[in-house]
From Swiss-Prot:
Catalyzes the formation of S-adenosylmethionine (AdoMet) from methionine and ATP. The overall synthetic reaction is composed of two sequential steps, AdoMet formation and the subsequent tripolyphosphate hydrolysis which occurs prior to release of AdoMet from the enzyme. Mg(2+) binds at residue 16. Binds 2 divalent ions per subunit. Binds 1 potassium ion per subunit. CDD domains: S-AdoMet_synt (cd18079). Pfam families: S-AdoMet_synt_C, S-AdoMet_synt_M, S-AdoMet_synt_N. It comes from Bacteroides thetaiotaomicron (strain ATCC 29148 / DSM 2079 / JCM 5827 / CCUG 10774 / NCTC 10582 / VPI-5482 / E50). It comes from the Bacteria. Keywords: ATP-binding, Cytoplasm, Magnesium, Metal-binding, Nucleotide-binding, One-carbon metabolism, Potassium, Transferase. This is S-adenosylmethionine synthase. It is an enzyme of class 2 (transferase). Homotetramer; dimer of dimers. GO terms for biological process: one-carbon metabolic process; S-adenosylmethionine biosynthetic process. ATP binds at residues 14, 164-166, 254-255, 263, 269-270, 286, 290. InterPro entries: ADOMET_SYNTHASE_CS, S-AdoMet_synt_C, S-AdoMet_synt_central, S-AdoMet_synt_N, S-AdoMet_synthetase, S-AdoMet_synthetase_sfam.
Length: 430
């Protein structure tokens, strides 16, 4: 008997993701001007208002208000009717200095013995069901919203689109855990009130709402989904699309009020969207707004890097890696591996974990250096998932009236590189 599995994603205009992107934009600017910055930046967004709070230790000085407004503008909240607009929203800051107690407990004379910024457990996961070693349901959910955002920015078709949106994809698997078909796709997108009722009656309003919904549903199926399918270059995934897919498009009906005006957004409230869509596991720590001394972020990236390279090397078809830390202690307390019975080596999961411990240095400073995490690389991670993205080298320019302008070349999504495959194959005799 097969089973159904579902993952969701949210767009860059979802209020929680607006908050994530602002927090990571603050982090990036501080790292651009002072790579040693210690940052924990939390953001709240609501009707006409942004509130920044958190702890920072840095030599840099940045304009927090300008950073927030630039992010909001880039996302697309540029009209007063959204009740949250880049030029007019208020921006309040309650950011203060990092606790010296924490700082003393983490920093060491030998940088390589830098302690973990907090206790906790972090997970990395990978599966070979997609080319980017991500769960298919989440990969498709992200893709749908990325294409929807492209359509919105082009302003050629579906011109009624607003920034807030969500998607959900349900995949049917067979008994062996192989995807066999796409069962259900849910798309909810914020939109303009683009059809006005003939009069003030409830009947006229209902008719106008139904006409809008009919157009949006048609456009999602006839414009959005063909572009999503065209962006997929994997024959096995393309074969999963079928005429029996159930589409739920704006199933609650009218969706004009949205974004931070519709729901308050907070940093760190989409941790499953950020990672594996419900597959694998999650230690509970959010990523955005945190510099890499916080193992919530850096160790989760390192665990993904390990799991992806292990699966790509052929050690297993699917792998979960857990690593845990004590605050102020450099070396992890444990490394745990689960191959879900899909290993291709004659070793127990515990034995595989011991080989991983020999191959990968999981001290926080070693992770920072291996994955180049002391660079301004984080705003790009804050929408459409931190995992499964394409590593790339980009040039980023930062503007500051206080520090001057600065251009840096950085490598994004380094934890997605398959740069340990050969070492792993040698270690496991593959």
């Amino acid at each position: 008997m097969g089973y159904l599995f579902t993952s969701e994603s949210v767009s860059e205009g979802h209020p929680d993701k607006v908050a994530d992107q602002i927090s990571d934009a603050v982090l990036d600017k501080l790292l651009a001007y002072d790579p040693s910055s210690k940052v924990a930046c939390e953001t709240l967004v609501t009707t006409g208002q942004v509130v920044l709070a958190g702890e920072v230790k840095t030599k840099a000085y940045v304009d927090l208000q300008l950073i927030a407004r630039e992010v909001i503008k880039k996302i697309g909240y540029t009209k007063g009717e959204y009740m949250f607009e880049s030029n007019s929203c208020g921006v309040l800051s309650a950011i203060h200095e990092q606790s010296p107690d924490i700082n003393r407990g983490v920093e060491r004379q030998d940088p390589m013995e830098q302690g973990a910024g907090d206790q906790g457990m972090m997970f990395g996961y990978a599966t070979n069901e997609t080319e980017n070693y991500m769960p298919l349901s989440l990969d498709l959910a992200h893709r749908i919203l990325q294409v929807l955002a492209d359509i919105r920015r082009e302003e050629k078709v579906m011109t009624y689109l607003r920034p807030d949106a969500k998607s959900q994809v349900t995949i049917e698997y067979d008994d062996n855990g192989t995807p066999v078909r796409i069962d259900t796709i849910v798309v909810s997108t914020q939109h303009d009130d683009f059809i006005q009722p003939a009069d003030d009656s409830a009947e006229a309003q209902l008719k106008a709402d139904e006409e809008m919904l009919s157009i949006i549903r048609r456009d999602v199926i006839e414009i959005l989904m063909p572009r999503v399918i065209a962006s997929i270059h994997h024959d096995k995934v393309l074969a999963l699309f079928n005429d029996q897919i159930v589409y739920h498009v704006n199933p609650t009906g009218k969706f004009v009020i949205g974004g931070p005006h519709g729901d308050t957004g907070l940093t760190g409230r989409k941790i499953i969207v950020d990672t594996y869509g419900g597959k694998g596991a999650h230690g509970g720590g959010a990523f955005s707004g945190k510099d890499p001394s916080k193992v919530d972020r850096s160790a989760a990236y390192a665990a993904r890097h390990i799991a992806k390279n292990m699966v790509a090397a052929g050690v297993a078809d699917e792998m979960l890696v857990q690593v845990s830390y004590a605050i102020g202690v450099a070396r992890p307390i444990n490394i745990f591996v689960d191959t879900y019975g899909r290993s291709h080596v004659n070793m127990t999961d515990g034995e595989i974990a011991r080989v991983i411990d020999q191959l990968f240095d999981l001290r926080p400073k070693a992770i920072e250096e291996r994955l180049k995490l002391r660079n301004p690389i984080y705003q790009e991670t804050a929408a459409y998932g931190h995992m499964g993205r394409e590593p790339q080298v980009v040039s980023k320019t930062f503007f500051s009236r206080y520090e001057g302008n600065k251009t840096v070349e950085v490598e994004l999504f380094t934890w997605e590189k398959l740069d340990y495959v050969d070492k792993i194959k040698a270690a496991f005799g593959l």
